[in-house]
Amino acid sequence: IGKAYSGFQHVAKAPLVQLDSNHFLLELFHGPTLAFKDFAMQLIGQLFQLSLQRRGERVTIVGATSGDTGSAAIEAFRGLAGVDVFILYPHGRVSDVQRRQMSTPSEGNVHAIAVDGDFDDCQARVKDMFNDFEFRDSVRLAGVNSINWARVLAQAVYYFSSAVALGAPARQVSFTVPTGNFGDIFAGFIAKRMGLPIDKLIVATNQNDILHRCLTQGAYKTSGVLPSISPSMDIQVSSNFERLLFEAYGRDGAAVSGLMAALKAEGGFSLSQGVLEMLQRDFQSGRCS
């Protein structure tokens, strides 16, 4: 763990900055690629290497990115033994800084691949690879997107550390989280389920506001992705929202599979009023552009 976070540029790793009497900013940009995903990715890289060295094995890691996941993954795994990394990103839809972070490392085990499409297209290809069991097993496929549970688990830690610094468990805290693929805010939901006294988790979206529409109206309907200056939020199919639905539907896998089938076939689905009200007890949302 110490090695994973040795490259962070602030002694607190995730410092809190007070903006007003009850308003604080949690700074998550002190990692090596300046992305919050460094918190999980740096740890996962070290855990992968430790496990693979003990077993004498090699794996192939694939991931999809709108920018920050890819640069964080390549930085975390570059030069590590036993790992080959392939990151798919949408051509022309990541920032120039992140494109350079992904494409300029010289280590032979990391590869950035531009895809003609958007992030959802990249993510779909990664899911297809994992669903092709023969291919998955032949190349020993592993993932670093937030479909990997370790990503979510590692991100839950700073919800605990920041809430405790602000007075938890005696004091409730709410978190507003810029949200695209729903992984970071889902980590907050897991922290709440573990007993952290979180009042509300507030989903902040841009014009790609499918999550805001779903949490306020109960309809999860896809539309075209609108490019913005925040490409990690330019997403229509939020993978970790499926995990939240699994909890909201009482861990009924068949019910959630039906919703996902409707999403694929019809471009959306509607929540029951009971499920919507259940989600609204924990979540609020807002949109800005």
Where are these regions (language model features)?
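PLP-dependent amino-acid enzyme catalytic core
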Residues: 1-289
